[in-house]
UniProtKB/Swiss-Prot annotation:
InterPro entries: Ribosomal_bL12, Ribosomal_bL12_C, Ribosomal_bL12_C/ClpS-like, Ribosomal_bL12_oligo, Ribosomal_bL12_oligo_N_sf. This is Large ribosomal subunit protein bL12. Disulfide bonds: none annotated. One of its GO terms (molecular function) is mRNA binding. Forms part of the ribosomal stalk which helps the ribosome interact with GTP-bound translation factors. Is thus essential for accurate translation. PANTHER family: 39S RIBOSOMAL PROTEIN L12 (PTHR45987), LARGE RIBOSOMAL SUBUNIT PROTEIN BL12M (PTHR45987:SF4). GO terms for biological process: translation. Belongs to the bacterial ribosomal protein bL12 family. GO terms for cellular component: cytosolic large ribosomal subunit. HAMAP family: Ribosomal_bL12 (MF_00368). The keyword Magnesium does not apply. The gene is rplL. It comes from the Bacteria.
Length: 123
């Protein structure tokens, strides 16, 4: 397989499939695809009393924004909730979407929801 063929295959994948691919690559090669800590670490280091980086986060939907329908769709995808439950969660913002989530997954969830138009906080 050529590099171009691999790139074309990746272009055709959904965000969920890409996330699974990254995790599989991390496990297979013993590496981490985490972004450099310099950017995110500066904000996190200020709040850390003992200097340790937080490993588990609560993903909180702060507000749905103008594209509420898109946010509901993303919340359904991320949580596996039904339409009624996802709508109730989004309508009741601020609400916790998931608790005790690994940093990479929390950041991925935040990016997906913000891309859909919502505002998210990681606590």
């Amino acid at each position: 397989m050529t590099r171009e063929e691999i790139i074309e295959a990746i272009k055709g994948m959904s965000v969920l499939e890409l996330n699974e691919l990254v995790k599989a690559c991390e496990e297979e090669f013993g590496v981490s695809a985490a972004a450099p800590v310099a950017v995110a670490g500066a904000a996190g280091a200020a709040g850390a009393a003992a200097g340790e980086e937080k490993t588990e986060f609560d993903v909180v939907l702060a507000e749905a924004g103008a594209k509420k329908l898109q946010v509901i769709k993303v919340v359904r995808e991320l949580t596996g909730l039904g339409l009624k439950d996802a709508k109730a969660l989004v309508d009741g913002a601020p609400k916790t979407i998931k608790e005790g989530v690994a940093k990479e997954e929390a950041e991925s969830m935040k990016a997906k929801i913000e891309e859909a138009g919502g505002k998210v906080e990681l606590k």
